[in-house]
């Protein structure tokens, strides 16, 4: 929870924040923008990594990247642009020691194991849950969620593996 809370604090301190990914991780970023809007009353737009160079970022901003491999070319390039612009950077990645994990200010390792096929279902689901947890934490910090509602969501997340097993 400490890493999740730390990332939520970065969102509270940022004047603007962007969620970024490409391909499957862009879909995770899209879903996540609704988590933040609905749970923390903050809208952070999802931007595709390959289009991020048109976004104006500065030192008060946070750029949150999502990458399964941690080596995604467009995402690395976009993070380089963000860092050059002075923005804070964070990422959720699946591969420890990857380029993206080394270049950001804060990294959360998702630990979902290797993807065996092109479809990144396991990694995408893990990243979605991490972003949901960050949005919940931010919602609690900002007073948008009561402690009871927060705990209920946490319990639901903890019971998810059992629900999957039943399917």
Regions found by a protein language model. Name each.
Residues 12-159:
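Glycine-rich phosphate-binding loops that contact phosphosugars or nucleotide phosphates
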Residues 1-13, 167:
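A short, well-structured juxtamembrane/interface segment
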Residues 159-167:
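Accessory alpha-helical/coil subdomains and C-terminal extensions
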């Amino acid at each position: 929870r400490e890493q999740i809370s730390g990332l939520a604090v970065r969102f509270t301190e940022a004047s603007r924040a962007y969620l970024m990914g490409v391909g499957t991780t862009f879909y995770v970023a899209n879903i996540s923008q609704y988590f933040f809007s609905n749970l923390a009353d903050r809208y952070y737009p999802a931007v595709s990594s390959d289009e991020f160079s048109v976004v104006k970022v500065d030192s008060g901003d946070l750029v949150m990247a999502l990458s399964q491999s941690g080596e995604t070319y467009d995402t690395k390039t976009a993070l380089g642009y963000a860092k050059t612009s002075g923005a804070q950077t964070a990422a959720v990645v699946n591969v420890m020691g990857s380029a993206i994990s080394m270049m950001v200010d804060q990294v959360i390792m998702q630990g979902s194991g290797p993807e065996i096929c092109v479809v990144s279902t396991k990694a995408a689901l893990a990243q979605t849950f991490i972003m949901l947890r960050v949005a919940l934490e931010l919602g609690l910090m900002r007073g948008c969620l009561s402690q009871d509602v927060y705990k209920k969501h946490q319990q639901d997340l903890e019971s998810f593996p059992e629900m999957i097993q039943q399917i």
